[in-house]
From Swiss-Prot:
Residues 1-26 form the signal peptide. Pfam families: PD40. It comes from Bacillus subtilis (strain 168). PANTHER family: PROTEIN TOLB, PROTEIN TOLB HOMOLOG. This is Uncharacterized protein YdjN. The gene is ydjN.
Length: 348
């Protein structure tokens, strides 16, 4: 049950398999995109990654294109808004992961790291000295949280312990305000066992037990365990409220809902489900607004436009919505009809 990521019908896999070459980036000089519709809550700014039908990935700061590049792997990225620096990953022809630093003012691009590892879910530390990311190694079946030192250009393992080959991190979130983490983790052995049993019986697999934890660097405290399919996690600035996307699966039919867990009481409730106007994605990526009064998330709008990429695969356009916790109302926040949103962040 390793983290499921749905792109333009898995164009990432197609690109990697085809050995897509690395292209020199075209800098758009903070070009505004006419097709982008933005309607964020007051004071909020979004960082959005989107891939179009030509497999060109663009990075937006609200409605401004701050960078674009040919897709070579799943786009993982983080923005230092104060210094106007974009950190992002991309693979080369040998399928090696590379971490780049792009100065958005001078347009200077620097490769910080190259290796056989995989990296996703990039977060910039509070003091801007470190990139936290989810690490995957070819010789391990589990995923980890690691910290990349921007000065030494080396990374170190944070969680789980280096000798632990069973515990795997399916998703994590870094709270820059409190310099803290929230994460989802589970047992690889349990997951394989349940998958094998389901295959033998020809039935849908039972969800692997997902454990919630939070803390700082090397000290994480367990919060709760649930037997549900859960794909992502995010926290409020005060670390008291935790958002996650849970979904059920019956055959090929998947139904998602966004839940909120109280870190103190350990109780949780469903707060967002499918509506007449949209269908939630199973990786809805819910996140709090800066004031904590709204929740941003990904969904497919009713009648969403279908796109076909250069490989012939089809997918529907995704939309970022917001939900008011006070008024219980929804609104469209960010949409581009010419590409598929990979992921987004509320900029701190």
């Amino acid at each position: 049950m390793k983290k499921r990521i749905i792109l333009l019908l898995a164009v990432i896999i197609a690109a990697a398999a085809a050995g897509v070459a690395f292209y020199v980036a075209k800098d758009k000089g903070h070009e505004k995109a006419a097709d982008v519709s933005v309607n964020t809550e007051s004071g909020d700014e979004l960082l959005v990654s989107i891939t179009d039908t030509d497999l060109l990935t663009k990075y937006y700061e609200n409605d401004k294109v701050i960078h674009e590049e040919k897709l070579t792997s799943y786009p993982a990225f983080a923005l230092d808004q104060k210094q106007q620096v974009l950190y992002y990953t991309g693979n080369n022809e040998q399928n090696e992961m590379r971490l780049f630093k792009l100065d958005l003012k001078s347009h200077k691009k620097t490769m910080l790291y190259k290796g056989a590892e995989s990296a996703d879910s990039l977060f910039l530390s509070k003091d801007r000295s470190t990139i936290y990311f989810r690490l995957g190694k070819a010789d391990e079946s589990n995923f980890r949280i690691a910290a990349f030192d921007l000065k030494t250009k080396k990374y170190k393992n944070l969680y789980p312990a280096a000798n632990d080959q069973d515990d795997t991190v399916s998703s994590f979130f870094y709270n820059q305000k409190n310099d803290s983490f929230a994460l989802l983790h589970y047992s690889v052995e349990e997951d394989y066992k349940k998958t094998d049993e389901a295959n033998e019986k020809g039935i849908d697999p039972e969800p692997t037990t997902i454990h919630f934890a939070e803390g700082r660097q090397n000290k994480f405290n367990e919060l709760k365990s649930l037997n549900q399919f859960i794909s992502d996690i995010a926290v409020s600035d005060d670390d008291k409220r935790i958002l996650f996307t849970s979904y059920t699966q019956k055959g090929t039919e998947q139904t998602a809902s966004i839940q909120m867990l109280n870190a103190d009481t350990k109780k949780y409730e469903s707060i967002i489900s499918n509506q007449k106007s949209f269908k939630l994605l199973i990786d809805a990526q819910p996140q709090f607004s800066k004031d904590g009064k709204n929740i941003y998330f990904l969904a497919e709008a009713k009648g969403a436009k279908k796109l076909k990429d250069e490989t012939g695969r089809e997918a529907k356009v995704r939309t970022i919505y917001s939900y008011s916790l006070e008024n219980k109302t929804f609104k469209k926040v960010w949409e581009n009809p010419n590409g598929i949103i990979n992921s987004f962040f509320v900029i701190n």
